UniProtKB/Swiss-Prot annotation:
Belongs to the ataxin-7 family. It comes from Homo sapiens. Residues 616-629, 685-695 have a biased composition (Polar residues). This is Ataxin-7. The lineage of its organism: Eukaryota, Metazoa, Chordata, Craniata, Vertebrata. Component of the SAGA transcription coactivator-HAT complex, at least composed of SUPT3H, GCN5L2, TAF5L, TAF6L, SUPT7L, TADA3L, TAD1L, TAF10, TAF12, TRRAP, TAF9 and ATXN7. The STAGA core complex is associated with a subcomplex required for histone deubiquitination composed of ATXN7L3, ENY2 and USP22. Interacts with SORBS1, PSMC1 and CRX. Interacts with TRRAP, GCN5L2 and TAF10. Interacts with alpha tubulin. There is a cross-link at residue 257 (Glycyl lysine isopeptide (Lys-Gly) (interchain with G-Cter in SUMO2)). One of its GO terms (biological process) is regulation of DNA repair. Residues 670-680 have a biased composition (Basic residues).
Length: 892
């Protein structure tokens, strides 16, 4: 009991000492030193370097008087090792004082060093300094650690400490110390404790170190950094199973090595050599997944490998089989001057410096295309050879890395994403070179973003990759063909991408023209609203719809400005309408009404749209207008003018009644123009001539710009009318129906039937239309009669004779004022028409089929004869006159 109590008492102070701070330990050291000075040193050398046994908690019963009585004897037995003061002496005092009194000599670092020197041979356990904790770890008995053997002194050292060891012990050596970053060196060596079965005892560790030193004692001290680079790249994922193979010719010999590598000291060869050696290493590894991160540098292509000028040069060479790779490298690494010139394969332009033909590929970017085309001696034309060369390169790419083409597929359609993710694990286990991952990652984004703007080098790729359909892509994880083609073009496209060839040759890194793109992403619960666009909630649906509509409207509006003559004339007409309204004198009230009438001429299409804006004005002219004209022609004079102009413009090539009606309402003008342009072309031949003429006249009344636009339309319509024998139509149909809306060409047929009822107050417009018809636009036989009726204005019999076919002889219906205004405007129009129709006298007659009358068609704006708009009519007359004057210029 006494010995046990004494041990317990001694254990408690040790525990307290461990808990005490550094200051307490220092004080204890000082006190212990004083005690040692007072007492003679113990006869035997102390082995305090052994860590004390784990302390035991003191029990209250152990501290009784019995323990105190036997403590002296216990100290006597243990005194040789630990001269600890008796707890009785320290009764009532804090344990810190007892710790100071019972300072353990082995605690001091200096004493430890001395004891190591004296008893290093006999030590069982090595004491470790706290300063060395980063080197040895927190718990060396259980930590995994790695050792290297110094070839100078055969000492086993941890890699983290190797540099300092070399500097300390062998700094006098002529060779410079080999600096090894701890992380990279650490990866060289598998844990010895694990490889030896995970033993935790120090003796086992030292013995394993001995094995290491024995196996690598013949190794040289220093390895070239390149050798070390390869070590780092290829030996990272080491496994204890392969311990038996320990290579001998290296300084930092890893305890485990996967495969022996014969490094080439040549800088360029080193990088390329890593390519072939990697595949074997990786395939033999148990955990190939670790490989990719461990080989960042070796994947960099050597300059020779980039000779082909491909955007992503390295992948083809690195991804080939080792044998193939070595052969390819030999060819690529040949200097340009050493190649044998072949005009069918090489650029062939004579180099001014060397006086020899250039031996770069046909896609050489040093010499211009014209220079390369001028080279003599090719078996085929240069362009043919270039196309063949590109095709061959693409085929090679397809054969070389079909796997790397697959990843792009999922990128285009996320549904295949699961196959893609499952694919990646496959690739590594099957020995795919880690270096592959880089090239093929770099090339991934390009194929899957055909919708994105591509760099100038990729137009051909875009054309090739865009057609690929996403469905085949995700049908199976490995469809090589669809996906491979774009990717192969990425790396082999040498047409447009070759401008970068020169700069690429100087780069030692892969690059991509796009921002990084995810290989795949989760689309669970999402809706696809476009290629690559997925929506995960519906909160923004309304906003998205509104935005889409706005964009569509904007694009459609812009479209009209860019469309060729037909649409352009339509738009000018609409613009002119406001001008005429403003400028038409009061005497030309009829002119403004004409616009309304024109609006009604396209009643079939426009009736609904036009009626709403201009319905108010109809009642004033209701008596003059037929029932239909009342509805559609009731529109305001301005609107009617616009509609008239639109109808005339639409009539030029393809504007049917629908087109003419569009202008009636400002909102509807653009859509009508679109419709008219579409419809006009099909029916131009038959009835367009009349419509075109009307449109041209009305547009001429408007701004000069409109006149220009209308002139092409008029010409077109006139030609179509002549072809369709518009002259016959114009004479009969116009006189019978007085088609108010001569503008719509295909409606012209309809106008003939409906024009009689359509006659409206727009006498002036009718007169203008009649003139247009005379100029060679026969009355529109095919246009809807209802629209013509609405557009037509009451015109005198004389007016109707004027190729105002759309306007039926309803002059009697029209009020006297409107009739007078019409005649007034008609006279100047006739004069103007005569001027314009210098070349075609037949234009005066309704039957004129020539295109010149079309220009006269601009006059129709004057046709608005509705009495209500007398105020606006004066301006309209002025516009009519001006338009007539300008029409000759507008002729195409």
């Amino acid at each position: 009991m006494s010995e046990r109590a004494a041990d317990d008492v001694r254990g408690e102070p040790r525990r307290a000492a461990a808990a005490a701070g550094g200051a307490a330990a220092a004080a204890a050291r000082q006190q212990q030193q004083q005690q040692q000075q007072q007492q003679p040193p113990p006869p035997q050398p102390q082995r305090q370097q052994h860590p004390p046994p784990p302390p035991r908690r003191t029990r209250p019963e152990d501290g009784g008087p019995g323990a105190a009585s036997t403590s002296a004897a216990a100290m006597a037995t243990v005194g040789e090792r630990r001269p600890l003061p008796s707890p009785e002496v320290m009764l009532g005092q804090s344990w810190n004082l007892w710790v100071e009194a019972s300072k353990l000599p082995g605690k001091d670092g200096t004493e430890l060093d001395e004891s190591f020197k004296e008893f290093g041979k006999n030590r069982e356990v090595m004491g470790l300094c706290r300063e060395d904790m980063p080197i040895f770890g927190f718990c060396p008995a259980h930590d995994d650690f790695y050792l290297v053997v110094c070839n100078d002194c055969n000492q086993v050292v941890k890699p983290q400490a190797f540099q300092s060891h070399y500097e300390r012990r062998h700094s006098s050596s002529s060779k410079p110390p080999l600096a090894v970053p701890p992380t990279s060196v650490f990866s060289f060596f598998p844990s010895l404790s694990k490889s030896k079965g995970g033993s935790a005892s120090g003796s086992n560790r030292s013995s394993s170190g001995g094995v290491l030193s024995a196996s690598s004692s013949s190794s040289k001290l220093l390895k070239s950094p390149k050798e070390k680079l390869q070590l780092r790249g290829n030996t990272r994922p080491m496994h204890p199973i392969q311990q038996s193979r320990v290579p001998h010719g290296r300084i930092m010999t890893p305890s485990v090595k996967v495969e022996k590598i014969h490094p080439k000291m040549d800088g360029t060869l080193l990088k390329s050599a890593v390519g072939p050696t990697c595949p074997a290493t990786v395939s033999s590894l148990v955990k190939p997944g670790l490989n990719c991160p461990s080989i960042p540098k070796p994947t960099l292509p050597s300059p020779g490998q980039i000779l082909n000028g491909k955007g992503l040069p390295a992948p083809p060479t690195l991804e080939k089989k080792p044998e193939d790779n070595s052969n390819n490298r030999k060819f690529l690494n040949k200097r340009l001057s050493e190649r044998e010139f072949d005009p069918d394969i090489h650029c062939g332009v004579i180099d001014l410096d060397t006086k020899k033909p250039c031996t770069r590929s046909l896609t050489c970017k040093t010499h211009s295309l014209t220079q390369r085309r001028a080279v003599q001696g090719r078996r085929k034309r240069f362009d043919v050879l270039l196309a063949e060369h590109k095709n061959k390169t693409r085929e090679k790419e397809l054969i070389r890395h079909p796997d790397s083409q697959q990843p792009p597929q999922p990128l285009r359609d996320p549904h295949p994403a699961p196959p893609r993710t499952s694919q990646e694990p496959h690739q590594n286990p099957h020995g795919v070179i880690p270096s592959e991952s880089k090239p093929f990652v770099a090339s991934k984004p390009k194929p899957h973003t055909p919708s994105l703007p591509r760099p100038p080098g990729c137009p051909a790729q875009q054309g090739g990759s865009a057609p690929i359909d996403p469905p085949p892509v995700h049908e199976s994880p490995h469809p090589p063909l669809p996906a491979t083609e774009p990717a192969s073009r990425l790396s082999s496209e040498e047409g447009e991408g070759d401008d970068k060839e020169e700069s690429v040759e100087k780069l030692d890194c892969h690059y991509s023209g796009h921002h990084p793109q995810p290989a795949s992403f989760c689309t669970f619960g999402s809706r696809q609203i476009g290629r690559g666009y997925y929506v995960f909630d519906s909160r923004w649906n309304r906003l998205r719809c509104a935005l889409n509509l706005m964009v569509e409207k904007h694009l459609n509006a812009q479209l009209w400005k860019k469309i060729p003559p037909v649409p352009s004339t339509t738009s000018p007409i609409s613009t002119r309408i406001p001008h005429r309204t403003n400028s038409v004198p009061t005497s030309q009230c009829g002119v403004s009404y004409l616009a309304a009438a024109t609006v009604s001429t396209s009643p079939v299409l426009l009736s609904s749209t036009c009626i709403s804006p201009n319905s108010k004005s109809v009642p004033a002219h209701g008596t003059t207008l037929n029932a239909q004209p009342a509805a559609s022609g009731a529109m305001d004079p301005v609107c009617s003018m616009q509609s008239r102009q639109v109808s005339s413009s639409s009539s030029s090539p393809s504007t049917p009644s629908g087109l003419s009606s569009v202008p009636s309402s400002p909102m509807s003008r653009k859509p009508q123009k679109l419709k008219s342009s579409k419809s006009l072309r099909p029916k131009e031949s038959s009835g367009n001539s009349t419509n075109c003429q009307n449109a041209s006249s009305s547009t001429s009344g408007g701004s000069g710009k409109k006149r220009k636009n209308s002139s092409p339309l008029l010409v077109h319509s006139s030609s179509s009318s002549s072809s369709s024998s518009s002259s016959s139509h114009s004479m009969e149909s116009f006189r019978k129906n007085c088609v108010a809306h001569s503008g719509p060409p295909y409606p012209s047929t309809v106008t003939s039937s409906h024009s009689i009822g359509l006659n409206c107050v727009t006498n002036k417009a009718n007169a203008v239309n009649v003139r247009h018809d005379q100029s060679g636009r026969g009355p529109p036989t095919g246009s809807p009669a209802e629209s013509i009726k609405r557009m037509s204005v009451m015109v005198n019999s004389s007016d109707s004779t004027l190729s105002l076919g759309p306007f039926i002889h309803q002059s009697n219906e029209l009020p006297v004022n409107s009739h007078g205004s019409f005649s007034h405007s008609h006279t100047p129009l006739d004069k103007l028409i005569g001027k314009k129709r210098k070349c075609s006298p037949s234009s005066s007659s309704i039957n004129n089929s020539s295109s010149k009358p079309t220009k006269v068609a601009k006059v129709p704006a004057v046709n608005n004869v509705h009495m209500k708009h007398t105020g606006t009519i004066p301006g309209a007359q002025g516009l009519m006159n001006s338009s007539l004057l300008h029409q000759p210029k507008a002729r195409p």
